[in-house]
Amino acid sequence: MNIHEYQAKEILRNYGVSVPNGRVAFTVEEAVEAAKELGSPVCVVKAQIHAGGRGKAGGVKVAKSLDEVRTYASELLGKVLVTHQTGPEGKEVKRLLIEEGCDIKKEYYIGLVVDRATSRVVLMGSEEGGTEIEEVAAKTPEKIFKEYIDPAVGLQAFQARRLAFNINIPKELVNQAVKFMMGLYQVFVDKDCSIAEINPLVVTGDGKVMALDAKLNFDSNALYRHKDILEYRDLDEEDPKEVEASKYDLNYIALDGNIGCMVNGAGLAMATMDIIKYYGGEPANFLDVGGGATAEKVTEAFKIILSDPNVKGIFVNIFGGIMKCDVIASGIVEATKQVGLNLPLVVRLEGTNVELGKKILQESGLNITAADSMADGAQKIVELVR
């Protein structure tokens, strides 16, 4: 789950991590009032959307008067911001962060992620702050330094200190930087983050180390124990189909193709998308109905798939282990009748009660194409949507 920059900074502030003073604003008047409260001669007006690259897209403005705050807030609120992370459709700006300006002396990068190769959290740092870290990794990987963290003892002060020296934090500010990194790590662990990224981390003219921007993403599987984090969820920033799917414990991710997929199990879902591509088709979604799908879940899955106007056909690929094929078949028949499906539908069933499942489909009287294998099903749906 993603949250906004101002929300991330609120969490960091609670952990003693240094961030600039700021206020969130939903209207132009609120933006002006926030700037008045801050009382800073320079304010930064920042568009709040769930995407990076806002500065390059014109979503970050420096205001030197209340009139400029009003002008920039008027420009940004309601604007559709297109960045390299939003896609061409962009995201509408519905809230702003009004933040006090600061005298930036030097920019750095600090980030925490889970490293799959070592199964450990890794603290990364670079003195190439303010730019895309992927770009730095590709062009000058030697400028990125890493500290792998032992989960039994957590981040140690000597590791944070070593990283601070490696990225050339001024010696007199190393202790501040160490405190910053230790606090950031505590947030990462306590809140079950998947990413904690500060880009840029800045050293200011008056000798402070602080987060000028902050990105926190959270492991969705751990949200049940973080009610406080769930309150930060902004449904306006999420795909409505994905939001609807989450209500029924369906794992749905929208894609750009025209073949809707309904599969049980993430691995099989990935393989299904691959084989559709192999035979010349384009999947419209990733949809994992899980191991305990009911007829109701299958019906809702169909509705979500069909809410995408690009879908021209559906491929259902089910391996019945825990889930029985006859239950899925009944769900497919019920869903097809409920939604009035008039698109090509190819179904491949295998596993527990497969013969009973096939019989239910055959006797339904509906226009359902049966497939003998995953490859057969993929070829059939690709042909049918052409």
From Swiss-Prot:
State the pathway, as annotated in the record: Carbohydrate metabolism; tricarboxylic acid cycle; succinate from succinyl-CoA (ligase route): step 1/1
Cofactors named for this entry: Mg(2+)
**What is one GO biological process annotated to this record?**
succinyl-CoA metabolic process
Q: What class of enzyme is it?
A: ligase
Q: Which domain of life is it from?
A: Bacteria
Give the matching Pfam families. ATP-grasp_2 (PF08442), Ligase_CoA (PF00549)
The positions annotated for binding substrate are N264, G321, I322, M323
Q: Cofactor comment in the record?
A: Binds 1 Mg(2+) ion per subunit.
GO MF terms on file?
Answer: ATP binding; magnesium ion binding; succinate-CoA ligase (ADP-forming) activity; succinate-CoA ligase (GDP-forming) activity
Q: In its keyword annotation, does this UniProt entry include Transport?
A: no
State where ATP binds: K46, G53, R54, G55, E99, C102, E107
Signal peptide coordinates: none
Classification via Gene3D superfamilies: ATP-grasp fold, A domain, ATP-grasp fold, B domain, Succinyl-CoA synthetase domains
Q: Kindly list the positions annotated as binding Mg(2+).
A: N199, D213
Catalyses which reaction(s) = succinate + ATP + CoA = succinyl-CoA + ADP + phosphate; GTP + succinate + CoA = succinyl-CoA + GDP + phosphate
- Please state the Enzyme Commission number of this protein: 6.2.1.5
Q: What are the UniProt keywords, alphabetically? A: ATP-binding, Ligase, Magnesium, Metal-binding, Nucleotide-binding, Tricarboxylic acid cycle
Q: Which SUPFAM superfamilies match?
A: Glutathione synthetase ATP-binding domain-like, Succinyl-CoA synthetase domains
One of the record's GO cellular component terms? cytosol
Role noted for this protein: Succinyl-CoA synthetase functions in the citric acid cycle (TCA), coupling the hydrolysis of succinyl-CoA to the synthesis of either ATP or GTP and thus represents the only step of substrate-level phosphorylation in the TCA. The beta subunit provides nucleotide specificity of the enzyme and binds the substrate succinate, while the binding sites for coenzyme A and phosphate are found in the alpha subunit.
User: HAMAP family, from UniProt?
Assistant: Succ_CoA_beta
Query: Record's family?
Result: Belongs to the succinate/malate CoA ligase beta subunit family.
PANTHER family noted in UniProt: SUCCINATE--COA LIGASE [GDP-FORMING] SUBUNIT BETA, MITOCHONDRIAL, SUCCINYL-COA SYNTHETASE BETA CHAIN
Supply the name of the protein.
Succinate--CoA ligase [ADP-forming] subunit beta
Native source organism of the sequence: Geobacillus sp. (strain WCH70)
